[in-house]
Regions:
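Conserved structured catalytic cores and adjacent interaction surfaces
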Residues: 11
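Alpha-helical oligomerization segments
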Residues: 141-179
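Charged linear interaction tracts used for macromolecular binding and regulation
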Residues: 54-144
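Amphipathic alpha-helical coiled-coil segments with heptad-repeat character
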Residues: 23, 27-30, 34, 51, ...
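Coiled-coil heptad-register positions
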Residues: 26, 48, 120, 124-127, ...
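N-terminal interaction modules that seed assembly of large macromolecular complexes
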Residues: 2, 15-81
Length: 179
């Protein structure tokens, strides 16, 4: 009577003589690097990894994989930068681990915040005026709900998209001159 083999045993038996090409090995190694960096950055953003520990782990990773450039880290951090979020921890890592000047990114984010605040205040003012004219509702206690205002949500989405485009152009340039 024959031996009953598991699917894993059958697959291993069929593939035991296969080897990876050098391209496949490089691709697999790059994927492993990307996943490790992604994991480190997520832990850092979640507060489970301090900045110093992240820097130490990253240096070990660079040594383990003989990495001379920081492109993978730059790309991962770039993906995480958003104009309406607190990006200081990410920008600090870009500055300290990758020696990148983040002034352009910081300027775009600051400009977004100022424009967003100003636009929201203007919209609140317009909504208060509309309430006063249409319903004769006035007073210091009147505070329109911007989240419920479709016109504001559309305006905010468009404003954010414009700043995201600016950020993306700057982020694309981060790898400029680095290979």
């Amino acid at each position: 009577m024959g031996e009953i083999k598991s699917t894993l045993d059958l697959v291993l038996e069929k593939t035991k003589n296969l080897t990876l090409s050098s391209e496949e090995k490089e691709e697999q190694e790059q994927k492993e690097i990307e996943n490790r960096i992604k994991g480190m950055m997520q832990k850092y953003q979640d507060g489970m990894l301090s900045k110093n520990q992240l820097k130490t782990d990253y240096e070990i990773l660079k040594k383990d994989y003989n990495m001379s450039q920081n492109n993978t880290l730059i790309i991962e951090i770039s993906k995480r930068i958003e104009p309406d979020q607190d990006n200081r921890p990410l920008l600090e890592i870009l500055q300290e681990c990758c020696t990148i000047d983040t002034a352009a990114i910081e300027t775009i984010i600051e400009n977004f915040r100022k424009a967003y605040f100003e636009a929201s205040q203007n919209r609140i003012k317009r909504l208060k005026e509309d309430l006063a004219l249409q319903y004769n509702i006035t007073g210091s206690a009147v505070l329109p709900n911007l989240a419920a205002d479709e016109q504001w949500r559309q305006e905010a989405r468009e404003m954010r998209a414009g700043y995201v485009d600016q950020l993306n152009r700057v982020k694309d340039n981060l790898l400029g001159g680095r290979s």
